[in-house]
Amino acid sequence: MSIPRLKSYLSMFAAVLMLGQVLSAQAEEALPDFTTLVEQASPAVVNISTKQKLPDRRIAAGQMPDLEGLPPMFREFFERNMPQQPRSPRGDRQREAQSLGSGFIISSDGYVLTNNHVVADADEIIVRLSDRSELQAKLVGTDPRTDVALLKVDGKNLPTVKLGDSEKLKVGEWVLAIGSPFGFDHSVTKGIVSAKGRTLPNDTYVPFIQTDVAINPGNSGGPLFNMNGEVVGINSQIFTRSGGFMGLSFAIPIDVAIDVSNQLKKDGKVSRGWLGVVIQEVNKDLAESFGLDKPAGALVAQVLEDGPAAKSGLQVGDVILSMNGQPIVMSADLPHLVGTLKAGAKAKLEIIRNGKRQNLDVTIGAMPDDDADIGTGTGADGSAERSSNRLGVSVSDLTAEQKKSLELKGGVVIKEVQDGPAAMIGLRPGDVISHLNNQAIASAKQFTEIAKDLPKNRSVSMRVLRQGRASFITFKLAE
């Protein structure tokens, strides 16, 4: 090999080596450094332990099994977990249950945020600080609907977290959690924001932040930080089929939590807006049946009598597209928006009614302490009118008592389901039909007349009440 060619190869090798070093340095710079954030934020993160007295259901001394024949390892296990204790004269011994969670200090005088499920039904709450000192905590108040609890400990000049704005959080942004998974204090995990505005079952009023941050038992109630060291959420739940972390974690937005904590601090309870409707998601078939361009909005399946919606003129079958200018993309968006308003607030709804857009002004009510009782549907007495169409159902008029119980002006109850579309979509005897093809049903006779003229090969909606709960379903009639 000639000297010039060797020099050329050496120059190329050096260039490649330098390029690799540059790329490596850039990659290192691209990865976030959490050390400063953790050092500054950790002192305000606390471990929360609770104690609760429960009736003792352990096996009594006279009922203990014979452990002598067991191997030493198993014998020690049972002796440790099933200690022989004498019964009290009344036999009403108590045992103590303990739980573990996390929290964070939001004020230097000792207010602490955590999850409601961490401290629910606790007889004693202990907050352990980062210096391992322990303080008794007083429960200021809880809000089970958002799973937020506010505690108070006696203290001065306590370290506090910085509060951020969860509305400014972006999908793909780095986030970090500090907590006590399985009791390991101040464990740090990191990840990114996977989605915003998630709705989980039984958590209608929380637009959850979804992340892939590793969250495990004991992390509940701990803070979720952004890269500025600000708390943007409270780690609350995970989705799992194994009992452990599977990459899906959910945090309560700090904006929601602070609003709740302010109300708990001031009033000891939380009040939120209420519309008084039962809503459901608008899928592709429902969108077609209601004349919508695409699936969007919240379909009103039921309007509660004397509720704010009923007084404002909202009707069953209306599709709510926006509230105060904020679009309702999914039905779950509506409770989030309504819940942030106070009783007496005015709101403007954009709705679709009978295929036409219109605006409706409503006055928001106060959320009842308990869920409203909307009645329970029962079977009907009397003769059934045979449906002479391809739905395959026999129906009869509702009795006056049933109409009153279900708060309906009309409708029919299914007496029998034959082979056909009704059976295919899961209708059952006892189901109540109040609307068919966007028309209110007054009687069995009207139901039969409407059914005869149903369009073919097009989605048709039907409003059905089962055990008092209303929902719209769709079906298609073939040629």
Swiss-Prot record:
GO process terms (BP): proteolysis
Location (main, coarse): periplasm
InterPro entries given in the database record: PDZ (IPR001478), PDZ_sf (IPR036034), Pept_S1C_Do (IPR011782), Peptidase_S1_PA (IPR009003), Peptidase_S1C (IPR001940)
Keyword annotations: Hydrolase, Periplasm, Protease, Repeat, Serine protease, Signal, Stress response
Entry annotation: catalytic residues: 117 (charge relay system), 147 (charge relay system), 220 (charge relay system)
GO cellular component: periplasmic space
Amino acids binding substrate: 218-220, 275-279
Superkingdom, natural source: Bacteria
Domain annotation PDZ: ranges: 264-355, 361-468
Signal peptide residues on this chain, from the entry's feature table: 1-27
Region (Disordered): 368-395
One function term, GO molecular function aspect: serine-type endopeptidase activity
Gene3D superfamilies in alphabetical order: 2.30.42.10, 2.40.10.120
EC number annotated for this UniProt entry: 3.4.21.107
Catalysed reactions listed for this entry: Acts on substrates that are at least partially unfolded. The cleavage site P1 residue is normally between a pair of hydrophobic residues, such as Val-|-Val
Subcellular location: Periplasm
NCBIfam families associated with the record: degP_htrA_DO (TIGR02037)
Recorded family membership: Belongs to the peptidase S1C family.
Function as written in the Swiss-Prot or TrEMBL entry: Might be efficient in the degradation of transiently denatured and unfolded proteins which accumulate in the periplasm following stress conditions.
Record's protein name: Probable periplasmic serine endoprotease DegP-like
Native source organism of the sequence: Pseudomonas putida (strain W619)
